[in-house]
Amino acid sequence: KDVVKWAEATGKPYGVYCITLPLKSSASTTPAPQHVVNHTVQVLSGAKFVYFRDSVSLAVAKEYGCTSPIMEFAPDGAFAVDLRDDEKAEAFLNANGLEAGKFLCCIPRLRYTPYWTIPSKKAKMDETKHARNEALKEHDHAQLRQGIIEVVRQTEMKVLVCPEDQTQMAVGKEMLYDPLPADVKAKVVWRPNYWLTGEAVSVYVRSAGLFGNEMHSPIMCIGNGIPAIVCRWAEQTSKGFMWKDIGLSEWLFDLDNEEEMKGIVPAIVAMAKDPKAAKVTAAKALAVVHQRQRESMAEVGRALV
């Protein structure tokens, strides 16, 4: 709506950069009505360019008749995040006995973000979302928890259970940290409080890698050359498929696919056992990201002349 209002008010052209085009949003339990999808495609068709952050979205746009003259893949903007808060990060790591390059990060996530657990949001509990979360929370975290156990028992690495959003400290404690065996828990740190992007990135870049059920922390890791494994599901839209688009299929797992799930723990352990090889894989993906950033931003630049 805002894009349409702006275009009508100014008469200026517009473009769209790095989006996912879902038929059902990650915050919704039902597909978008057809008229909403049609309107979205109409707005995109009026753009001078549309860059999608995953190839699945690009295919959806074409299927629904989007006619923008330039429709291509371009990586999520978060790959370029360079915020840092080294002072806070180092203080946190020192206080918790975490040494640079000697720990992995793990991020939990429920199927739907339970905003109703954040007092400041003043959100009413969504019974449908809550039921879905409860039904699948063990299913969605069992492999991460086992990955933590195997990393601690098979390597010298420690593990930091940390959040990407304000609901995940509690999820991490319940689903990952508390159930761990005593011998493993001794080498696992649970972060009890939220952090801002700068501190989080400064911790990520000091880790040997990250794994979990989130998307943007892995993006920021790869953007800084740090290995990252992504576990996804249908409720998260198609954004996770960007991992395939940048050459990281081996680090993308669909939790709705029981066969794929079998590879999660081995991938986590491999990352911990051979961090040098993992960094080479991350660097190759980052090279793809940089190439597409250069090419797509060049087109944006031409559109602004």
Predicted regions, residues:
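Active-site anion-handling motifs in enzyme catalytic cores
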Residues: 1-305
